[in-house]
Amino acid sequence: AVIISAICMLIYIWFRFKDVRFASSAVLALLHDLLFVLTFYALARTSVGNTFIACMLTILGYSINATIVIFDRIREELRVMKRNDDLKALVNRSITYTLTRSIYTTFTTFVMVAVLYIMGVSSIKEFAAPLMVGIAGGGYSSVCITGALWYVMKTKIGGKKAAKKK
C-alpha cells in the first residue's frame, strides 16, 4: 500500500508540475521520511502491523502536502523569473516565503499528536509515537531537503537549458 501510494504521488506531482524533477525530489524526500520512521520502529522495537501501515500512509500524506506547498511556490517564482535571475536564490526565496507556514503547521500537528499520545490508550500511543517522529522528519525534509534536491536535479540533470539559467 505504501509503495502504491508513493507511485501514485510520483505520477500526480509529475503531471501537476509538468516536471519529473519535482516528482522525483518529492519521492526521495518521502523515502527519507519513511526510513526515518522505520528506524524509529526498529529502535523502539515496536511491532509492525495494521498500525504501521496506517502510520506510514499518514506520514506520506502529511509530508507530501508540506512538500507541494513549497514546490508550488517555486513554480510561481519560476513563472516570474527573469532571464538573469539566480535559480539558487529563487529556491531559497521560495522556501523562505513558506517557512513560517511550514513551521506553524508542523508544530501544531506535532502538539496535537503529542496530546493524543499523552491522553490515549495503548493502541493510540502505538500510532501517535511514530507519527510524531514522522511529522518531525517530514517537516524537516519538506523544508530542508526537497528544494535543495530539486535545485541539484534542475542544475545537474537539467541539461544545457539549466546550465544557462545558472
How does the language model describe each region?
Residues 16-17, 44-46, 119-121, 154:
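Short helix-capping/hinge motifs at transmembrane helix termini and TM-loop junctions
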Residues 18-25, 69-72, 76, 122-126, ...:
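Short helix-terminus and kink motifs of transmembrane alpha helices
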Residues 26, 83-119, 129, 135, ...:
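Pore- and gate-forming transmembrane helices of large, multi-pass membrane proteins
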Residues 53-73, 100, 104-112, 141-147:
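Transmembrane alpha-helix detector for multi-pass membrane proteins
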